[in-house]
Amino acid sequence: MAESMVTDPIYLDETAKANGAKLDLLNATMLGVSASLGVLAKAQTGIFEEMDYNAIKAVVDAGSAPITFPTGTQLVNTYTGKDGKAYDCPWDVVQPDDTAEGESGATVPAMVLQMHYATLYDLQFSAYQAFYVVPDGGLVAGTYNVKMGLNWGNNVKTDAVYQFTLTKAAPAGARLTGFYNAPDVVPANWKVYVYKDQQKSELLETCSVTAGSAGTNLGTFLAKENGDLNGLHPVGYGDNRWWKSAYRQYLNSDAAAGAWWQPQDKWDMKPDQADTLPGFLSGFSDDFKSALSRVKVVTYGNGVTDDGSAVVTYDKIFLPSLQEIYCSPQVSGEGSYWPYWKERTGAKTPQALWQTYPLRITRDLAQRTVGRFVRLRSANRGSGYGAFVVYSSGLVGTWGGISALRSAPACKITKLA
């Protein structure tokens, strides 16, 4: 039976403002701090006040967050875009009564906040990954071929062999990329690209690909890494694993454009936006950045390019998982559900994947009537390239790692250093 649709969200902007007005008085009485602990009203000057993060941490550490900051409360700070324009940036209290584990293993009370609106800029979860690392001694000019060891989509067929010709030698450490979107692009349009390094500092050559087995065989493509070749899934559509994602690096950095990305393994390639986007945290105040702690985040692999087991990262900012936003996960263990999403959707049980839920639409920070695709960190367990997203329509599905999308990231407020 189809789940009945809830059309009125639990937390309207008006509700959050009303809750905030009540909390202002309560917080001022209890803590003697600014009314900025609740939902903030815009000042006549157009400046949005910053929150007293030390006071908030004290409330959380005392175990009083569920009373002081009930689920759905909005705490507002300021985000400044790369053009210098400032936006009020509400954070929803999605779980006031949580715990967080730090890198030392210490566990403390925590309150989970999630951005109410989508981030300002599109970013790839992962770039197209390299398929071959040029070994010491380089590759001489000449013809090379690869064999397909899998069926994938309409155009990748087992035992088919394709060749390409280097017109000049490729130096040691260069990366070969290509076969982009291979299952959905006819082989006649495939290319191989030779980059000097993983930073893509120089494109040395672009080669056409044709059917044929002339020259030196470099190996056989499988979905996963095989011999000297990377898996065709991340080569063709990007990698879907949170631990090595460009998105993770972006969200956790305040470095300038061109300075926040580093390769996470030998196949990783720089995303297209890395040279033009500064790190996400660069848009926030020093006070907010100082209030953030690296906390344990658990994310499972995909079961295709790896064994699908859990990987632990320690992140200040992280993308939500399916489980955390009250959707039915493909594997349990990527955090616990956040009551905000249960109450916002009105769902009685975790919502099914591949269905559309209008109350899940996340709108743009700058254009607040415009819905955006927002990334989750959960990998599609059945592929080495697709990660889950919530579409601009509210559909919960997957999208290739190479697609540049927005997000509504989260953080945990704790006393951890």
Segments from the language model and where they lie:
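A short tyrosine-centered beta-strand micro-motif
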Residues: 144-146
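Short, low-complexity N-terminal tether/leader segments at secretion or assembly junctions of large
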Residues: 1-31
